[in-house]
């Protein structure tokens, strides 16, 4: 196992993953912390011709399309930015208006997007 920093950037992740593929001949899978970096990783995987699975987080349309198209990108966990902003703003306003207790954690739903539901997924 290895950890590298693609800086959540497509072009940086492309180079990082190309190097990882060369350095690790038994590499079978990659997790990216966001779909932007994952798209760079996908380009590196496709360029290598290797069977390496890719997963990520965000649910960005480009990533969802890559999953639906049957690429090495097999899964992303979709976050819902509108809900994150709505809840965060509500908490900030509550505190501004005098609330003294704001929860340390507020769960917000996520959804796994894979080959079974990618064609029908949207935010």
Question: Where are the predicted features?
Answer:
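A residue-level marker of the well-folded mature domains of exported/periplasmic proteins
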Residues: 1-123
């Amino acid at each position: 196992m290895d950890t590298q920093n693609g800086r959540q950037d497509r072009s940086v992740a492309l180079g990082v993953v190309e190097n990882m593929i060369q350095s690790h001949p038994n590499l079978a899978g990659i997790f990216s912390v966001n779909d932007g970096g994952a798209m760079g990783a996908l380009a590196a995987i496709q360029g290598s011709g290797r069977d390496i699975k890719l997963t990520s987080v965000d649910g960005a349309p480009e990533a969802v399309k890559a999953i639906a198209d049957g690429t090495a990108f097999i899964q992303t966990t979709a976050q819902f930015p509108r809900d994150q902003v709505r809840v965060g703003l509500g908490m900030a306003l509550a505190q501004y208006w005098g609330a003294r207790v704001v929860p340390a954690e507020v769960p917000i739903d996520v959804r796994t997007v894979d080959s079974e539901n990618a064609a029908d997924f949207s935010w």
